[in-house]
């Protein structure tokens, strides 16, 4: 049972990843994203194919560092580096705190967390780039630019693993999926008021495209080889290989 005080009561007009959101983020996404724990597990499991010796891994929009924490806990001997970027200083602080003990006892992986505007970062050559629920908050121009950076950054055979939210192909399916999603959040003990407030706060912050457009943007950036590994309601996960 999720305690009422663990939920996010959003009364602000615009959604922001501020200190209040960061502190309760892990609980909040588990309430708000279908199969979120499984999604994290799938993302980390997929990463095993691309964690090569002496390569760099990026987590764009790393939030509280949960994905990186799980990668650090993998039972592998590969030596590599991970950089986690987020535009929230509080998220970065929480990520460092969450992973500090693991990093201290782990000599094979170098980890660096940085608070930066992800739309303005430069990416070095890498073998794996992960992005969990960042892209819905990027407008079309930002998305195009970042996808091109990601493709250019990846080594040949390197991978981009992305989880995002999309629109349905038409209004009929969009209505059905939205209602199912609403019921899902109610089942996670979010109140109707909390769900409505969250939806209102995201009006000017979220930019969603349908699956066809997402594929088109991937291909325009250079990715021709990609596959979907998750889909539930309006949430998808895919892996694209350069």
Regions found by a protein language model. Give the residues of each.
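N-terminal, positively charged/glycine-rich alpha-helical extensions of SAM-dependent methyltransferases
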Residues: 1-24
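Conserved alpha-helix/loop element of class I SAM-dependent methyltransferases that forms part
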Residues: 35-53
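Conserved class I S-adenosyl-L-methionine
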Residues: 54-63
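Class I SAM-dependent methyltransferase SAM/SAH-binding core
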Residues: 58, 68-119
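A conserved beta-strand element that flanks and buttresses the S-adenosyl-L-methionine
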Residues: 130
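A short glycine-rich, Lys/Arg-flanked "PGG" loop and its adjoining helix->strand segment in the class I
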Residues: 144-156
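Conserved beta-strand signature within the Rossmann-like core of class I S-adenosyl-L-methionine
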Residues: 157-165
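C-terminal alpha-helical "lid/dimerization" subdomain adjacent to the S-adenosyl-L-methionine
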Residues: 166-220
């Amino acid at each position: 049972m999720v305690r009422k005080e663990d939920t996010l009561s959003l009364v602000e007009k615009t959604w922001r990843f501020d200190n209040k959101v960061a502190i309760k983020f892990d609980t909040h996404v588990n309430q708000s994203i279908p199969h979120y724990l499984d999604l994290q597990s799938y993302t980390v499991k997929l990463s095993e194919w691309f964690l090569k010796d002496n390569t760099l891994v990026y987590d764009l929009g790393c939030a509280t560092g949960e994905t990186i924490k799980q990668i650090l806990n993998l039972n592998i001997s590969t030596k590599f580096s991970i950089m986690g970027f987020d535009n929230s200083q509080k998220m970065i602080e929480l990520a460092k705190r969450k992973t500090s003990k693991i990093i201290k006892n782990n000599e094979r992986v170098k980890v660096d967390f940085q608070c930066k505007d992800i739309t303005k970062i430069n990416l070095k050559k890498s073998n794996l780039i992960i992005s969990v629920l960042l892209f819905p908050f990027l407008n079309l121009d930002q998305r195009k630019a970042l996808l091109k950076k990601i493709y250019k950054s990846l080594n040949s055979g390197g991978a981009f693993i992305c989880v995002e939210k999309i629109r349905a192909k038409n209004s009929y399916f969009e209505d059905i999926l939205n209602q199912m999603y609403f019921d899902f959040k109610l089942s996670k003990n979010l109140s109707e008021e909390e769900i409505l407030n969250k939806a209102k706060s995201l009006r000017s912050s979220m930019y969603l495209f349908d699956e066809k457009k997402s594929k088109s943007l991937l291909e325009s950036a250079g990715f021709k080889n990609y596959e979907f590994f998750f889909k539930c309601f309006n949430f998808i996960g895919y892996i694209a290989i350069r």
